[in-house]
């Protein structure tokens, strides 16, 4: 009984070994990287400039990219018959939780706030960026240069995985930085036979860094606010240094701002920046040395241009949606004489910038 068992085991082992040798010599198969998987690590540090899009479901196509350089070598299973050639095929696997598919891009979760979609450059004869995940995408180079039978296969330069793009999807609106720890976003496998891939990726791509959504407010009525003072006689300014021009009116404007990413308890202040009059630093220059414009806050105090210590606190509403609030205040403006002299006749105008500070 013992002798028969030994003979049976020997025959079975020989049969399996023979079958494996025949398969390797007769067909194409997967490609294996020399020295293990090549790692590409990209750093992402980007800011969402349009904060109005900090909403659930918003997408930013080609939000960032990577171009890392670096090469690696591979050898592929090929038949011994050198007349047989085949394309080199790629498969990209994304090891993250799937979120959604939008316009042929598949988005995968990075953290609680964001998801990303990626594409990667398949070089060779294709030279195109392909959205991940995918399988059996050829590089359109039908040859045997990667075959393990060729000593030169280890000299072939491979770069796939080194270049690509990232698209961003907002899962939940957020304030400030969303940190991305080192996260694998794809494994790239290679083969010479469709759907027959090895277990070792040729390359893997990792990303890390942060995405920032800044806080801010913008004027609801647009980017500019015009205050027309009207027409005056030159004598309206004479002998009135530092005073409102005769017959002038204080123009009061109510300001409404749309603010993004302002947390509960945060205070918002308005201050003025601009070119001050050379003869009176409390006034905005109007292009005439004898005339300036003064801007007051709602409390009647002058908002001195370029003085950060002089500001007007805004009234801030509760949240109107997930990320937005409104803020409001009033300002008054009027022309003054800065010298008491009779100004030259002509048109005069000035420009001031309203600066918002968040504390």
UniProtKB/Swiss-Prot annotation:
Gene Ontology biological-process annotations: cell adhesion involved in single-species biofilm formation
Similarity section: Belongs to the fimbrial protein family.
Keywords per UniProt: Fimbrium, Signal
Principal location: other
GO cellular component: pilus
Species of the source: Salmonella typhimurium (strain LT2 / SGSC1412 / ATCC 700720)
InterPro entries cross-referenced by the UniProt entry: Adhesion_dom_fimbrial (IPR000259), Adhesion_dom_fimbrial_sf (IPR036937), Adhesion_dom_sf (IPR008966), Bact_Fimbrial_Adh_Pro (IPR050263)
Compartmental location: Fimbrium
Gene3D superfamilies attached to this UniProt entry: Fimbrial-type adhesion domain
Name by which UniProt lists this protein: Protein LpfD
Signal peptide per UniProt: 1-24
Lineage: Bacteria, Pseudomonadati, Pseudomonadota, Gammaproteobacteria, Enterobacterales
Name of the gene encoding the protein in the UniProt record: lpfD
């Amino acid at each position: 009984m013992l002798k028969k068992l030994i003979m049976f085991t020997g025959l079975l082992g020989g049969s399996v070994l023979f079958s494996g040798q025949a398969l390797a010599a007769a067909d194409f198969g997967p490609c294996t990287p020399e020295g293990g998987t090549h790692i590409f690590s990209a750093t992402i540090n980007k800011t969402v400039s349009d904060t109005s899009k900090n909403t659930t479901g918003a997408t930013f196509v080609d939000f960032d990219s990577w171009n890392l350089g670096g090469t690696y070598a591979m050898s592929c299973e090929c038949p011994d018959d050198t007349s047989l050639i085949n394309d080199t095929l790629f498969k990209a696997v994304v090891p993250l939780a799937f979120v959604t598919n939008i316009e042929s891009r598949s988005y995968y979760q990075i953290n609680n706030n964001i998801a990303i979609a990626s594409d990667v450059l398949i070089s060779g004869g294709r030279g195109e960026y392909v959205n991940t995940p995918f399988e059996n995408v050829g590089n359109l180079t039908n040859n045997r240069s990667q075959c393990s039978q060729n000593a030169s296969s280890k000299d072939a330069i491979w770069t796939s995985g080194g270049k690509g793009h990232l698209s961003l999807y907002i899962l939940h609106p957020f304030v400030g930085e969303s940190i991305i720890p080192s996260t694998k976003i794809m494994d790239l496998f290679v083969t010479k036979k469709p759907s027959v891939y090895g277990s070792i990726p040729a390359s893997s791509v990792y990303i890390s860094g942060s995405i920032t959504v800044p806080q801010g407010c913008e004027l609801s009525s647009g980017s500019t606010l015009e205050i027309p003072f009207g027409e005056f006689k030159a004598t309206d300014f004479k002998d009135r240094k530092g005073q409102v021009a005769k017959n002038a009116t204080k123009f009061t404007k109510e300001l409404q701002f749309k603010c993004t990413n302002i947390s509960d308890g945060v205070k918002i202040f308005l201050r003025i920046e601009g070119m001050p009059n050379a003869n009176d630093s409390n006034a905005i220059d109007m292009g005439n040395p004898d005339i300036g414009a003064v801007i007051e806050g709602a409390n009647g105090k002058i908002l001195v241009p370029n003085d950060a210590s002089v500001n007007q606190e805004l009234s801030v509403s509760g949240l109107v949606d997930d990320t937005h609030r409104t803020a409001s205040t009033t300002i008054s403006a009027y022309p003054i004489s800065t010298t008491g002299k009779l100004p030259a006749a002509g048109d005069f105008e000035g420009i001031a910038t309203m600066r918002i500070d968040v504390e």
